[in-house]
Design a protein with these regions (language model features):
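A cross-kingdom feature that marks ATP-driven nucleic-acid transaction machinery
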Residues: 1-134
Length: 134
């Protein structure tokens, strides 16, 4: 196996997964900084939200979950080479809406390369928002 084939087979997939996971952490750090600077108020906890529904045999993870007294803000973080599409947004929204025990106040999306389209009432952040030095 040549070097290029080895990279394509073993390194590239692991690298993509690593960068995506690290980007999720950067997004959580962004919200931590927003809270510490006073730009966001009322956040009790910042993390990921994992769910397991044995009745419907569904499980999954939401990348960024902000806990408030009256519910959660859920954000899906995507480290894509291209803008996030409206179809992807709709699939993610459907996944959030299927979780009945979770009180969701707001759904948002974070895409490093922005969005092909934006639809109300969701919140949108891109790489410029996350990495702005404000």
């Amino acid at each position: 196996m040549g070097a290029e084939a080895f990279y394509d087979e073993y390194i590239a997939p692991a690298l993509t997964d690593f960068i995506s996971r690290r980007f999720e952490g950067v997004c959580r750090d962004y919200f931590s900084l927003q809270v510490r600077s006073g730009k966001m108020k009322g956040v009790r906890n910042i993390g990921s939200y994992y769910y397991d529904d044995p009745i419907y045999r569904k499980n999954g993870e939401f990348d960024v979950a902000l806990e408030f007294a009256d519910g959660y803000e859920i954000y899906e973080a995507k480290y894509y080479a291209q803008p996030m599409t409206l179809d992807e947004i709709h699939r993610e929204v459907q996944q959030v809406e299927e979780i009945k025990e979770l009180t969701v106040k707001q759904i948002g999306f974070i895409a490093i390369n922005g969005f092909a389209e934006r639809k109300e009432p969701y919140l949108y952040l891109d790489g410029n928002d996350i990495f702005a030095n404000e």
